[in-house]
Curated annotation (Swiss-Prot):
InterPro entries: Cyt_P450, Cyt_P450_CS, Cyt_P450_E_grp-I, Cyt_P450_sf
PROSITE patterns the UniProt entry points to: CYTOCHROME_P450
Keywords, sorted A to Z: Alkaloid metabolism, Heme, Iron, Membrane, Metal-binding, Monooxygenase, Oxidoreductase, Transmembrane, Transmembrane helix
Primary enzyme class: oxidoreductase
Keyword Hydrolase (UniProt): no
Family: Belongs to the cytochrome P450 family.
Residues annotated for heme binding in this entry: C432
Cofactors, names only: heme
Name of the protein described by the UniProt record: (S)-canadine synthase CYP719A21
Location in the cell: Membrane
Membrane topology: Single-pass membrane protein
Amino acid sequence: MIMSNLWILTLISTILAVFAAVLIIFRRRISASTTEWPVGPKTLPIIGNLHILGGTALHVVLHKLAEVYGSVMTIWIGSWKPVIIVSDFDRAWEVLVNKSSDYSAREMPEITKIGTANWRTISSSDSGPFWATLRKGLQSVALSPQHLASQTAHQERDIIKLIKNLKDEAALNSGMVKPLDHLKKATVRLISRLIYGQDFDDDKYVEDMHDVIEFLIRISGYAQLAEVFYYAKYLPSHKRAVTGAEEAKRRVIALVRPFLQSNPATNTYLHFLKSQLYPEEVIIFAIFEAYLLGVDSTSSTTAWALAFLIREPSVQEKLYQELKNFTANNNRTMLKVEDVNKLPYLQAVVKETMRMKPIAPLAIPHKACKDTSLMGKKVDKGTKVMVNIHALHHTEKVWKEPYKFMPERFLQKHDKAMEQSLLPFSAGMRICAGMELGKLQFSFSLANLVNAFKWSCVSDGVLPDMSDLLGFVLFMKTPLEARIVPRL
């Protein structure tokens, strides 16, 4: 009994000693910083503000906290690495655009090293010569206007295949379809052509790449857990995630490596990457990054748009009438890639979808790469800043009825605040490199899917679930299932 009590006392003493040591380190870390931290919620020892960050999506929680503590606040996340959260378009513009070079560094979860060649991809690396060259290569070669224009015939053929696949699925399931996988595979084909310069009629590579992306999505939540809570990396679930990430890495290498032996056309991303004499792993994961960020962002946003149109049949009908009139006036049945920017209501629906459900509601964290300032207050080098895109898109002083899906708002005259607050692809020097392709493919897919089918609920009164999950992009918690009726 005495030994048992001694063991308990020893354990308690050890815990208290560790706790005291942690507090001392914490206080020293704070006193050493010259950053003038904005106000934020009170913290608890060890966990910081972690106790108030759960219960719902993080971007929503942070938006609600900003309403209490201000549009620029400090959140302490588990490991006592403070993060400045920006929820106001003026301050977001200061960080992302006006002082873009000051806040252009990155700080990523350790687990992401596995799938980024040790943070040597466009989205994961700090700004610098390597980052600038890699980004310029993607934009000026694979995503150049000339190269994208050369893909239009392929995109139009892909949409015909997509429509046929949906019709076939509907015929087997009493009119019901699950469009997301079809959308993803169409985007995999498009990105594959931009990377390799060859067509992928054989679905094997498309299926395998799609499967790897899906596999990574399933474990992405653990990477986020490690991001917000340092000690999560010691949990068994996180260790399983690391094992999963290593498995995904092996699968990606096995998929992409055979293409490195080819002699690709000069207007392809692969040719550019090989010309830079990068290590094999850098080339492979630069290619995989294009898939990872391009496939799910485009397909998920299209699925969100279809869900909104099912919930708002009058909006769907108005969009269909615009598409119907346009195709009739041009004596054809389908929309071409070149048409999408000539359709104002389509573009209004596209913008409103990206406002309501931005691809990344929390922008990838930026880090100050030198001593700088925010709102005239000192910010130390190494300070982490995160812009809450969701908050910018749902601020009542900028958006009338911000939680209502209302494309008409973009057909009216709007002020500078609306323009600067709509940032689905972020802004400044680290704006999404694939922004133009993403918008184009989203607009083109949505236009033809609404032109080809009437979209409705799977059963009367059962509307699509608009709950979301934050992974690499903002996903639908319940993948969209809909009933379609062919219009053509």
